[in-house]
Each structure stands twice: as C-alpha cells, then as structure tokens.
Amino acid sequence: MAVRVLCACVRRLPTAFAPLPRLPTLAAARPLSTTLFAAETRTRPGAPLPALVLAQVPGRVTQLCRQYSDAPPLTLEGIKDRVLYVLKLYDKIDPEKLSVNSHFMKDLGLDSLDQVEIIMAMEDEFGFEIPDIDAEKLMCPQEIVDYIADKKDVYE
C-alpha cells in the first residue's frame, strides 16, 4: 500500500514542478485578482485549455492574520469549572465530596504527594508552571482558582 502511494507521488512530481502559466503584466500587477487570459499562453502540460482560462493571480500584497489562540477568554467561572473538572478526573478524589472550598488534606484525605500531582495537572491544564513556593500554599480548589486568575489577569 505504501509503495503504491509513494510511486503515485513520485509520478506526479514533474507536473508539480512545472512552470506556472505566463500571465499578462496587467494581471500580475493586481494582487490576488481573478483574471482571464488567452488560451495561447503556456499552462501546465496536460491541462485542458478552453478559449479563455480563469486564474487566481497571486500578487505582492499579502494580508497576514495571526491567530495566537482559539480559546475563548478566561473567566472566573470558566477557571473554576476547569479546576473542578480536573479534580473530578483525579482517581483519589471522591467527586461527591468535592466542592470549591474542600481542603485537600483535611476534607478529601489526600497527602502531600497527591497535592503535588494535582498542581502538576493544573499546570498541564492551564499551560504555565506554578513555582513550588506558591504550590505549597494551594490547599483547596478556590485557592487554585484565585491563583490562576491572578496569574492570567482575570478579574471578572
């Protein structure tokens, strides 16, 4: 199967690197314009040629649009929901006992190693590192929500 796909790709290489059509200079001056050009101009080999051919002409003007993140902006409610979701997925936490104000060690019966694993899961979820000095102070979900909101500048 892979051999057939590779052979098909190799057979298409000459047409992929064939020279592009020659266009009138007037058409090349317009960025990304739709242009009609005469059939006697050169096009890729094997392409059918009607009397007039419609083509997209790339120009020198390029509009760049950067999308840094597809995620919606963070809100306090969104942070709280994500924190509780991650905690509910943790196998040592009973979801019925979990609330925003549950203390990890007193209410949920976790130890310090579990607390470190929770902080690591929060780092993965929110995409930034929580220093050990700050991580030691985060003992309940509400403290984690407040910390993340402070670091991500969410005050809604």
UniProtKB/Swiss-Prot annotation:
Alphabetized GO MF terms: acyl binding; acyl carrier activity; fatty acid binding; mitochondrial large ribosomal subunit binding; NADH dehydrogenase (ubiquinone) activity; oxidoreductase activity
InterPro entries the UniProt entry points to: ACP, ACP-like_sf, PP-bd_ACP, Ppantetheine_attach_site
GO (cellular component) term, any one: respiratory chain complex I
Organelle transit peptide residues: 1-68
UniProt domain Carrier: residue ranges: 77-152
Primary location recorded for the protein, binned into one broad class: mitochondrion
Residue numbers carrying O-(pantetheine 4'-phosphoryl)serine: S112
One Pfam entry name: PP-binding
Subcellular location: Mitochondrion
Post-translational modification remark: Phosphopantetheinylation at Ser-112 is essential for interactions with LYR motif-containing proteins.
Region forming the signal peptide: none
NCBIfam families documented for this protein: acyl_carrier, PRK00982.1-2
Quaternary organization: Mammalian complex I is composed of 45 different subunits. Interacts with ETFRF1. Identified in a complex composed of MALSU1, MIEF1 upstream open reading frame protein and NDUFAB1; within the trimeric complex MIEF1 upstream open reading frame protein functions as a bridging scaffold that interacts with MALSU1 on one side, and with NDUFAB1 on the other side. The complex interacts with the mitochondrial large ribosomal subunit. Interacts with alpha-1-microglobulin chain; this interaction is required for the maintenance of mitochondrial redox homeostasis.
Physiological role: Carrier of the growing fatty acid chain in fatty acid biosynthesis. Accessory and non-catalytic subunit of the mitochondrial membrane respiratory chain NADH dehydrogenase (Complex I), which functions in the transfer of electrons from NADH to the respiratory chain. Accessory protein, of the core iron-sulfur cluster (ISC) assembly complex, that regulates, in association with LYRM4, the stability and the cysteine desulfurase activity of NFS1 and participates in the [2Fe-2S] clusters assembly on the scaffolding protein ISCU.
Family label: Belongs to the acyl carrier protein (ACP) family.
Protein name (record): Acyl carrier protein, mitochondrial
Organism: Bos taurus
Source organism phylogeny: Eukaryota, Metazoa, Chordata, Craniata, Vertebrata
